[in-house]
Amino acid sequence: MNIEELNGKKLTDVKLTDGSLEFICDDGSIFLMYHDQNCCESVYIDEITPEWREILIGQTVTYAYESMNQDLGPKSGWESSYTWTFYRISTTAGQVVIRWYGTSNGYYSERVSFIQTAKPQDENRPLIGQKREIDGHIYRLS
């Protein structure tokens, strides 16, 4: 899966945590951008457009894409393998650039993952927070 899945989605929230970004859409779908850390590499968000919340939240994504660059060079001289990964997300309010930096000894992945963690709500599926009876018990869906 790639970040182009966000094209046309309206973002109701974006959560930045230590090492990941979660994109929550108005149709119930949720996407996660992260790196699954191993032992011998370091991959992290190096920089993000300062006004990212204002540009993304409540807006529809008009264009989202990923690009990589190794021509920028390593952040310090000792890295034998490094990757700069850029994610650009545009809305009518502007563009956000998320710059990830990864370094390793060359044997470990420096890639950023983008996955869907929740699918859009549909008519046949109860919305989160609604009650449903299963085997005689009432459950609140979360």
Listing of model-derived features with the role each one plays in the protein:
Residues M1-R125:
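Surface-exposed, interaction-prone regions used to assemble/regulate multi-protein complexes
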Residues P126-S142:
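Short, low-complexity, charged amphipathic interaction modules
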